[in-house]
Amino acid sequence: MEIIKEIIVVEGKDDARRLKEIFECTVIETGGLHISAETIKVLKRALATNGIIIFTDSDKAGDLIRKQILRRLKYSNQDNIKHALLESENKEVEMSSRLEIMKALKKVTTFYARGAKEGLTLSDLIELGLTGSQSRERREKVQQHFQLGNGNNKRLLERINYFRIKREEIEEIIHQKNKTPPEGLEPPT
């Protein structure tokens, strides 16, 4: 399975599931037209790291979501924002064939070489106390500090590895209080 470098922005969970059947990738769902401030923060962070690919349905709603993302990111330099487009009009990502999705994404995607992507494992999260009972406060502290958005352990691990956050950085946040976020990140609001 090929590994995609950029975060892919899709409309919903079914779109995300479909992409993960085809590629190893990090996906963010907008949940439709009402994109949360938290999602925008994660996307801004992704722009500064590996970039994003907007891959919405090829219908009017998909176009509106694409425009809203661009407007809310207030990002004039489009170099780190790529657009994957389905060739058929009024086609949903989740209902598209494997070939259609691969064709759309391969035009704009950067791929990792196998083995080039390293990072933390679920065992690391367990050792850091970010999973299991009594872990919620610690996990939320890490998610908020690094602007990773909310989510389950799998999503947390995926985003930690996507943003190449080191175990030592996480340990520092867990053990310190009121530390400012890394350079280039806004303090949590």
Positions of PLM-derived features:
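Glycine-rich, flexible N-terminal cofactor/catalytic loop recognition
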Residues: 1-11, 16-22, 26
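TOPRIM fold recognition
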Residues: 2, 21-25, 33, 37-179, ...
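Conserved PDZ fold ligand-binding element
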Residues: 29
